[in-house]
Amino acid sequence: MGQKIHPYGLRLGITSEWRSRWYADKQYADYLAEDIKIRDFLSKGLERAGIADVVIERTRDRVRVDIHTARPGIVIGRRGAEADRIRGKLEKLTGKQVQLNILEVKNVDASAQLVAQSIAEQLSNRVAFRRAMRKAIQGAMRQPQVKGIKVVCSGRLGGAEMGRTERYHEGRVPLHTLRAEIDYGTFEAHTTFGRIGVKVWIYKGDVVGGRRESLINARDDRGSRRGRNDRPRRGGGRRRRAAEQKQEG
């Protein structure tokens, strides 16, 4: 089941949090449709901005939209003109006051959505698909929090007459493990031969007690490097053996 289901939805409440945070009784369908329209508007209108995630939070009379982007300058615009335009469009769409928060994604190679978008952009620019996939994998595996990555491209790869699917992976990507933090992203590349779908899974370690395993291991490594008193002294084994031989003699 872990191979087929969306990794984010499978782990909701375990390792992943809700991207739409609100409560509604009779207006549930209206709010859900609004959220879909907001996400579609941002993904299509700000395709060049490299949007990794959109989090929507609602109160009674206000909507808060957090945009996680790799290029915040494109979203903000000159003197905030683009941000004001986006806010006006969203207020017209929702009919409520919109609070827009633009957050920068500093580690682009560790975000599955941004990696998938990068591969799709390269495919649209006629870069060989194997080269684009391997480059993305190498860039992701250089990041300390990334334990494994899996990339899948599907379509008329290289302009072939028949569509096919190519897969590359490196490291571990345990899709069945619920405590595993799996980041997932998809994007479509528009080429002269048709659309090519790109999917990326990135494994960032297990979440133990609300903390990521990779962060815990990094802290433990730092602590062991600082305090080296627990290391055995050189020559200790020889002295111990000599003392044992004396006692036997």
Swiss-Prot record:
Residues 218-249 are annotated as: Disordered. One of its GO terms (molecular function) is mRNA binding. Keywords: Ribonucleoprotein, Ribosomal protein, RNA-binding, rRNA-binding. Residues 38-106 form the KH type-2 domain. Residues 218-233 have a biased composition (Basic and acidic residues). GO terms for biological process: translation. InterPro entries: KH_dom, KH_dom-like_a/b, KH_dom_type_2, KH_sf_prok-type, Ribosomal_S3_C_sf, Ribosomal_uS3_bac-typ, Ribosomal_uS3_C, Ribosomal_uS3_CS. SUPFAM superfamilies: Prokaryotic type KH domain (KH-domain type II), Ribosomal protein S3 C-terminal domain. GO terms for cellular component: cytosolic small ribosomal subunit. Disulfide bonds: none annotated. Transmembrane segments: none annotated. Binds the lower part of the 30S subunit head. Binds mRNA in the 70S ribosome, positioning it for translation. HAMAP family: Ribosomal_uS3_B (MF_01309_B). Part of the 30S ribosomal subunit. Forms a tight complex with proteins S10 and S14. Belongs to the universal ribosomal protein uS3 family. PANTHER family: 30S/40S RIBOSOMAL PROTEIN S3, SMALL RIBOSOMAL SUBUNIT PROTEIN US3C. NCBIfam families: rpsC_bact. This is Small ribosomal subunit protein uS3. It comes from Corynebacterium kroppenstedtii (strain DSM 44385 / JCM 11950 / CIP 105744 / CCUG 35717). The gene is rpsC.
